[in-house]
């Protein structure tokens, strides 16, 4: 629920917002169907250089696939230097399970760090943005096989190389 107009939230306040798609399925304009809840929590602190937002998936389904677990995003601003303006680094930690209608479950735990390394000083122009991505994750498959993936050479994503509304990875190694 949105607080009544005029109700101020003070810095340091824990905020919890629940997106409730109901229990019967909510069709989206693109044809996907969702149900369940996503609970978003964060501490309101507008002056901080770091912000963390947690997403908890509760009985959440997307096109009959059940998603359970948490994703946490932490956005931190770097300190400006003589050669680099202050820019954001976003760290995503996840511990999620996807269960398909046939009962197969996939569990993934991991971390991804995305840093904008070029283009941050031109906020109105997204095409010049370049991101560097690092991280690692472990996936457990239904047959209990475990696969660990690690970005051994940072991935570079250039927004100028967008194809079909998706930016492309132009370099880097995942092993």
Q: PLM ranges: what are they?
A:
Residues 1-175:
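Low-complexity, intrinsically disordered segments exposed to solvent
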